[in-house]
């Protein structure tokens, strides 16, 4: 990564700009450029790619993305202290780094993209990571504006994202993520790699949108999954009673025994129940 050798070490950048991590912003800075390069390569190929990065901080991952050939990086940062450090990187890569000072939770990147498909690559602030992911998974229309996500989460959250039926971590997030994407944990990163070190191991997850997920209404799917996993130890015939449809009818439409529990139902089963929930609503309005 000789292309960034003339930039200061990240520890020096943090010291110069007084970038002590703010707990309120969920910040844990990854300083090892070998690890940031590994994350960037996981989103490859990057040549000619447009990348959206959330929470770049001092810019370690930003530098890796640019050094590995990303044509355009849109860096969304909510900490005003980091902006000067990012501008230094922008000066080294003229016309390739666009810095957006805003809150990622309310930011719509699509006007910045036009018709270009992007990749989302980020060491996400832990306190908003799940919120952001659910927003991206809820994108309409589908397929979405991004072609891939390579994201870092706490290991526990990563396990929930990739979990499938009969796994302890399986829940609402796993249903939504695996309905719309192919998911995989790529590798773990030790707490010691961060400043300050978090209390938990982190994991890098890749999510690739499925071009044609099994058809159903997303909101209905979320509603069924929320009801089922809200009382995950109860049978479906009990846990689904909060829905505006007969639980037995929903289960029957999916070919599922209503005495089963949510954790044993595959994503396809939730999709089938969501379709039946939509059908029952339509029946009630005709």
From Swiss-Prot:
**Compartment annotation:** Cytoplasm
- Which SUPFAM superfamilies does the UniProt entry name for this protein? S-adenosyl-L-methionine-dependent methyltransferases
Q: Give a GO cellular-component term.
A: cytosol
Main location per the UniProt record: cytoplasm
Report whether Transferase shows up as a keyword of the record. Answer: yes
Classification via InterPro entries: KsgA/Erm (IPR001737), rRNA_Ade_diMease-like_C (IPR023165), rRNA_Ade_Mease_Trfase_CS (IPR020596), rRNA_Ade_methylase_Trfase_N (IPR020598), rRNA_adenine_dimethylase (IPR011530), SAM-dependent_MTases_sf (IPR029063)
Q: Which domain of life is it from?
A: Bacteria
This enzyme catalyses:
adenosine(1518)/adenosine(1519) in 16S rRNA + 4 S-adenosyl-L-methionine = N(6)-dimethyladenosine(1518)/N(6)-dimethyladenosine(1519) in 16S rRNA + 4 S-adenosyl-L-homocysteine + 4 H(+)
Q: Does the keyword Coiled coil apply?
A: no
**What are the binding positions for S-adenosyl-L-methionine in this chain?**
28, 30, 55, 77, 103, 123
Main EC class the enzyme belongs to? transferase
In this record, what's one Pfam family? RrnaAD
GO molecular function list: 16S rRNA (adenine(1518)-N(6)/adenine(1519)-N(6))-dimethyltransferase activity; RNA binding
Q: What is its EC number?
A: 2.1.1.182
Keywords assigned? Cytoplasm, Methyltransferase, RNA-binding, rRNA processing, S-adenosyl-L-methionine, Transferase
The entry's family comment says: Belongs to the class I-like SAM-binding methyltransferase superfamily. rRNA adenine N(6)-methyltransferase family. RsmA subfamily.
Q: Which HAMAP family match?
A: 16SrRNA_methyltr_A (MF_00607)
| PANTHER family associated with the record | DIMETHYLADENOSINE TRANSFERASE, DIMETHYLADENOSINE TRANSFERASE-RELATED
What is the documented function of this protein? Specifically dimethylates two adjacent adenosines (A1518 and A1519) in the loop of a conserved hairpin near the 3'-end of 16S rRNA in the 30S particle. May play a critical role in biogenesis of 30S subunits.
Q: What is this protein called?
A: Ribosomal RNA small subunit methyltransferase A
